[in-house]
Amino acid sequence: MDSINKDVLDACRGLAAYGMGTGIGGQISIRIPGEELMVSHAFDKTFEEMHEADIFTVDFNGNPVGTNRPVSIGIEFHHGIYRQRPDVNAIIHSHGFWATTQAALARPLRIFANVTTPFYGKTCTSPNDDFASIGPALGEEDIAIIIPWHGVITIGNGIAEAVAYHTTFDYGARQDLTLPADTPTMPEDQIAEIATMVNGTGYYKHTWDLVRRTGQECYNGTRVFPRLIP
């Protein structure tokens, strides 16, 4: 199995293990270097159900290559982002409960933990999930996109970053949604320093490795059964 295809499959199963793949919808993609192509997956299965045959190449017009399997219409914003942001090589959009509920607030995360500091000032809000809406909203350094009443997109220079951002956003959303509205957030003068520290620790690679391991542990040979999250 091609390494990019395997990374997409591992991301599907890993996010499923974290409870972000229980329903139809969402997309994971990785850019194929030097070509207007990406690797994504079929629309008619959940992340929990993905197998090798469900992973395939998609062109930048949103058409599957070499298969007639259906692909999500939402894939349109993926190639739009890849064209606008050459630094982005992987994109994640899921309908996990916490991130989707957070999106209903139509605002960035409140910062309560060191690992969520990288989202401060690098999260945009798009009024819709088409690229005509996302493109103008997306800044040059943004790593997350909130679509109100829909969900969240995370983007990274590779699959490790994109997946780690996604699971970390989900963690931050749980904090934001369960802590009282008057809970003090991290002081602004500390956020940049801590974000620099987080970005330099190898956190994203280690988190990706953890997510991948967890997906493998929760896969029973047929599908992924999500782990219990405290």
Model-derived features with residue positions:
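Glycine-rich flexible loops
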Residues: 1-230
